[in-house]
Amino acid sequence: MRRIDRHQNGGSGWIVDEILKHGLHINRYQPLSAKSYIPLLKEISNRKATINIQNKDDRCFMYCLGRALDPNPEKHNLDRVSKHLKQVCVDLKLDQIVMPVTMKHLNKVEKTYDVSVNVFGHNGPDIYPIRLTEATFTSEVNLLVTTNEETNHYVWIRDFDRLNFRVTKCKNKKYFCMRCIQHF
């Protein structure tokens, strides 16, 4: 109603005679959080820039951070939940994170573990930013959220530039801005 009053008082010359229909829609809020394994699109997984950890629980965020922050990373089968990965998560005290992690909890995680966390989404093969941190910490982790009808899943982006690189005639390495996803 205030909008209608402002419109009338703004000098438009129009007068509202009657309101024919008024509707109110209420939706249940479900914050974006991530749970168990979801396979990536072939267009994304073929770029070899992500590690999609095949977990059966809701700890994909913890496993992604563990892989990214591992001081002695494994050489093979990085997409599997191994004893080594579980031990890294215990050593770094990542097992204290409340799962599943929602976007509003990321600031607390960043301060607690001294790590910058950027989250990206995808629409088909196209990548876009969902949450870019303003804080600067000693480590930086980029995550991709993939979704299906039921749930979401975090995937560690190991090489952001390679993830966004498309096949072109130019063979030189391209560097991408995380905010606008443009290369230079």
Model-derived regions, located:
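Metal-dependent nucleotidyl/phosphoryl-transfer cores and adjacent nucleic-acid-binding surfaces
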Residues: M1-F184
